[in-house]
Design a protein with these regions (language model features):
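Catalytic-core region of right-hand nucleic acid polymerases
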Residues: 67-71, 75-79
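Gly/Ser-rich oxyanion-binding loop with an adjacent helix/lid
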Residues: 2-44, 49-68, 99-107, 111-249, ...
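N-terminal pre-core extensions flanking Radical SAM catalytic domains
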Residues: 391-399
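Extracellular structured ligand-interaction cores
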Residues: 72-74, 139, 254
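C-terminal nucleotide
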Residues: 1-51, 55, 76, 80-115, ...
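Short, flexible, solvent-exposed loop/turn segments with mixed acidic/basic and small polar residues
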Residues: 67-68, 385-390
Length: 433
């Protein structure tokens, strides 16, 4: 297990070859930190990508659709079992570590109070697995490093949680348990379960807890676990369904840049994020509480799937009407965008991205001056389509440009802009038996 071999294996699985040296450097960081912590080699290595959201702002938890891809940036991860029940996670990029000792990984799965930042995600993942798979031995050392821009709307927090969950689950053998086999039957099920670890909800027969405090869906997790190189993927949610994949034309290139304001899901930003989720839930409650027999819905998407139902709910929605309008309009863009990618229709994507950005600003209200300016700058720099993405209240934007001009566009758009060709899903790159 060498950095070069791991990077080469990742390229062989479909990652953009231009990323080879960056990933070799990332795995060098991880393996050097492992060697400093332990004398024996790691047992497992993974690549866990971030998520690029093309369309589908705040639709997933309402049962709507999203168009996403696995990003070219993400987490390099290695892990090995411990002889005790403790969990130690080392962030080789930050030079930081976190240890759950004495371990909370008991039948009680007691959460550690007062944790913030990435430590909270580690604690939540470890304790949820201990609760749902109480008979498994989850003690592990995990070393990771990321080249994702933090809090930029590329799902760095969800990717971290998935990295920890995958590592602990692999070492603990949870996929062989009756609990897993009875409840998780596909990668989409796994993605939905990982989302429930994050948001605290139960999944099928696997009971929930408090999660990390955000009330999100499984869009990010679905992209990370199901990504296809050079393709954008359509999903619908509640329940999760795959809608298909559309290849990004070879002469098109995604470019991503951050606005300079971190989209942290903490404090006021988390409250604003959760308010959008709560508004979607309130609309569903309005529909289901109106007393009409035979028309209860399991999601907001189901409540508006018929035009007459949508009109009925719109008439009832009052101050929630902008939230409803945004959901309906953004959800409808997904099949249109998939068709546009399939046809190579740049004009259609230009229109769809302009409308999505305008609706986020006017109806959803999750944009800030910096994200608005970033999208405007992308268009002025020559992008034929551009849009902000992620939870909002900071973060990043994507732009679509001709591949031949991508390098020049990156320099023109901003110093941190980078090419982001859709890559492979989470991959376990190598194991030792």
């Amino acid at each position: 297990m060498t950095p070069q071999a791991l990077a080469d294996a990742l390229i062989d699985r479909g990652l953009d070859p231009a990323e080879r040296e960056a990933k070799r450097t990332l795995f060098t960081q991880v393996l050097d930190a492992w060697a400093h912590a332990r004398r024996d080699p790691p047992q497992h290595a993974w690549w866990v990508p971030g998520r690029l959201e093309v369309f589908g702002k705040h639709t997933d938890y309402g049962g709507g659709r999203a168009l996403v891809a696995a990003a070219t940036r993400g987490f390099a991860v290695v892990a090995g079992a411990r002889t005790d029940a403790g969990v130690r996670v080392i962030d080789a990029g930050r030079g930081d570590s976190f240890e759950l000792l004495p371990s909370p990984l008991t039948a009680a799965a007691t959460r550690t109070e007062g944790l913030t930042g990435w430590r909270r995600y580690v604690d939540v993942a470890a304790c949820r697995l201990a609760k749902n798979f109480a008979r498994q031995e989850l003690g592990a050392d995990i070393v990771l490093a990321s080249d994702l821009p933090p809090a930029a709307g590329m799902s760095s927090s969800s990717a971290l949680l998935i990295a920890i969950t995958e590592a602990l689950g692999r070492i603990g053998g949870i996929a062989r348990t009756p609990e897993w086999r009875q409840n998780i039957r596909s990668p989409l099920d796994a993605a939905a379960y990982y989302a429930c670890i994050e948001n605290g909800r139960s999944f099928a027969g696997l009971n929930g807890d408090g999660g990390v405090g955000t009330h999100g869906g499984s869009e990010d997790h679905s992209a990370i676990l199901n990504g296809v190189p050079r393709h954008v993927l359509g999903f619908a949610f509640v329940p999760s369904r795959a809608l298909g994949a559309a290849r990004v034309p070879d002469d098109w290139q995604f470019v991503v840049a951050t606005c300079g304001v971190k989209a942290n899901k903490t404090g006021a930003a988390r409250e604003a994020y959760n308010r959008l989720s709560a508004d979607a839930a309130a609309l569903l409650d309005l529909w289901n509480g109106r007393g009409a027999a035979g028309a209860r819905a399991i999601s907001l998407a189901a409540a508006v799937e018929r035009p007459d139902w949508a009109e009925t709910l719109r008439a009832m929605s009052g101050p929630l009407e902008p939230r409803l309008q945004h959901f309906i309009r953004e959800d409808a863009r997904i099949p249109q965008a998939m068709e546009a990618f399939t046809r190579g229709d740049a004009d259609a994507l230009a229109r769809l991205s302009r409308e999505s950005q305008a609706d986020a600003e006017r109806l959803l209200g999750n944009q800030i001056p910096e994200t608005i300016a970033l999208v405007s700058a992308a268009r002025k720099a020559g992008a034929f389509a551009a849009c902000s993405f992620g939870a909002g209240f900071g973060g990043a934007a994507w732009a679509l440009v001709e591949t031949r001009s991508a390098e020049h566009f990156c320099r023109k758009w901003g110093r941190d802009a980078f090419a982001c060709r859709p890559g492979p899903s989470l991959i376990e790159l190598t194991t030792t038996k």
